[in-house]
Each structure stands twice: as structure tokens, then as C-alpha cells.
């Protein structure tokens, strides 16, 4: 059936190719752009010898051609440790400034929310992280249990008979002479 359908499709395709359009409407050159109106692209010129770019500058030849950068000016020492200067360094005064203010004042130019006494800030990233971890753990446990059950059923000869038949197989394989000697004692 599939071979016949493929043959019919092939014949139909060949028939479409052989039959020419009556008005010559299908022409591949219509789909391609005309290159007659386009100017040819200019050939890139070679860089002149007086250009600043030289690959020899990248090679280290043992001497230092680069000028040494000037040392940055040293910051002035801060005369008042309670008001840190804009030297760009971090000191103990910055730490003390953050906790030394009264209520509502969190430090210099601090823009925090004003909380009442006894009110704690919520950590917004902790709860979703814990919930996500629990969901992933439960999903993993469920998928592992399902895979275990499939494997368990795969190796049973008859899944409907269960454990009852397994006990009967054990007793059938026992040696009758051993059973007789145990019963005689």
C-alpha cells in the first residue's frame, strides 16, 4: 500500500514537471534578483605603510616600550574618623556609622524602611527556595517508586499470582527424603 502511494506521488510530481505552464508564468529567474543594476563592490585598499598598526608592537623584545603610568596621588588622611572622607577606602568608621544612628536613622544617607520595635524583616528568598526543594524531593521520590514498581513487575513471571505461588514453588522443589526424615523424628 505504501509502495503504491509513493509511486503515485512520484508519477504525479514527474507529470507536473513535464507539463509546461501555458503562459510561461513559472520562471526561476523571476525569483532571483537582477544583478545588472548593481554596481560592483569596491576592492578594499591595502593599508599604507605609515599606518599606526604594527604587529611588531605586540611582540615583547626584552625592553619596555610602554611608558610607565604615573602613580595615583595618595589620599589625604582623614582628621575626623566619625565622618569618613571620599578616599574610596572602607574603614571601621563606616561600620560604626551604620549602627550608631537612633530610630529611623540607619546611617549616612541610609534609605531603609522604618520598622516598629519587635518587627522583623521577611526574607523573601528563603520560603520559595524551601518549597521548591521539597517539591523536587517529592517528585524524585514518586518517580523512583514508580520505576521500582515497574522493575519489580517486569521480573515476575505472573504478576497476578503474587507471593502465594512463590511459596508453593519453594515447597515443590524441596527434597522428599529430607521431609520424611524430619517428620519421623
UniProtKB/Swiss-Prot annotation:
Q: How does it sit in the membrane?
A: Single-pass type I membrane protein
Assigned keywords, A-Z: Cell adhesion, Glycoprotein, Membrane, Phosphoprotein, Signal, Transmembrane, Transmembrane helix
Protein modification: Extensively O-glycosylated.
Biased region (Acidic residues) positions are 51-64
Q: Which Pfam families match?
A: CD99L2 (PF12301)
- Coiled-coil region: none
Tell me which residues bear Phosphoserine. 168
Per UniProt, the ranges with Gly residues bias are 99-111
Q: Where in the cell is it found?
A: Membrane
**Residue ranges crossing the lipid bilayer per the database entry:** 123-147
Question: InterPro entries, alphabetically?
Answer: CD99L2 (IPR022078)
Segment forming the signal sequence: 1-22
Membrane side Cytoplasmic: residue ranges: 148-185
- Identify the stretch(es) annotated as Disordered: 27-124, 160-185
**Positions modified as Phosphothreonine?**
181
* Extracellular topological domain residue ranges: 23-122
Q: Spell out the Pro residues composition-biased ranges.
A: 69-82
- Composition bias (Low complexity) maps to 83-92
Q: Which GO terms describe its cellular component?
A: cytoplasm; focal adhesion; plasma membrane
Could you provide one GO biological process annotation from this protein's UniProt record?
positive regulation of neutrophil extravasation
What this chain does, per the record? Involved in T-cell adhesion processes and in spontaneous rosette formation with erythrocytes. Plays a role in a late step of leukocyte extravasation helping leukocytes to overcome the endothelial basement membrane. Acts at the same site as, but independently of, PECAM1. Involved in T-cell adhesion processes.
Q: What protein family is recorded?
A: Belongs to the CD99 family.
* Further comment: The gene coding for this protein is located in the pseudoautosomal region 1 (PAR1) of X and Y chromosomes.
What is the name listed in the Swiss-Prot or TrEMBL entry for this protein?
CD99 antigen
Native organism? Homo sapiens (Human)
Amino acid at each position: 500500500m505504501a509502495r503504491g502511494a509513493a509511486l503515485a506521488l512520484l508519477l504525479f510530481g514527474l507529470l507536473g514537471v513535464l507539463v509546461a505552464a501555458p503562459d510561461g508564468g513559472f520562471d526561476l529567474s523571476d525569483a532571483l534578483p537582477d544583478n545588472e543594476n548593481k554596481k560592483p563592490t569596491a576592492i578594499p585598499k591595502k593599508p599604507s605603510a605609515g599606518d599606526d598598526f604594527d604587529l611588531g608592537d605586540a611582540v615583547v623584545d626584552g625592553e619596555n616600550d610602554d611608558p610607565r603610568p604615573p602613580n595615583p596621588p595618595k589620599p589625604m588622611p582623614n582628621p575626623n574618623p566619625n565622618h569618613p572622607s571620599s578616599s574610596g577606602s572602607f574603614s571601621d568608621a563606616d561600620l560604626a556609622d551604620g549602627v550608631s544612628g537612633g530610630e529611623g536613622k540607619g546611617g549616612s544617607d541610609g534609605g531603609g524602611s522604618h520598622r516598629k520595635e519587635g518587627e522583623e524583616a521577611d526574607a523573601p528568598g528563603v520560603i520559595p527556595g524551601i518549597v521548591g526543594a521539597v517539591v523536587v524531593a517529592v517528585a524524585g521520590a514518586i518517580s523512583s517508586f514508580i520505576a521500582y514498581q515497574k522493575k519489580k513487575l517486569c521480573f515476575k513471571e505472573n504478576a497476578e499470582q503474587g507471593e502465594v505461588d512463590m511459596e508453593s514453588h519453594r515447597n515443590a522443589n524441596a527434597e522428599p527424603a529430607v521431609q520424611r526424615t524430619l517428620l519421623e523424628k
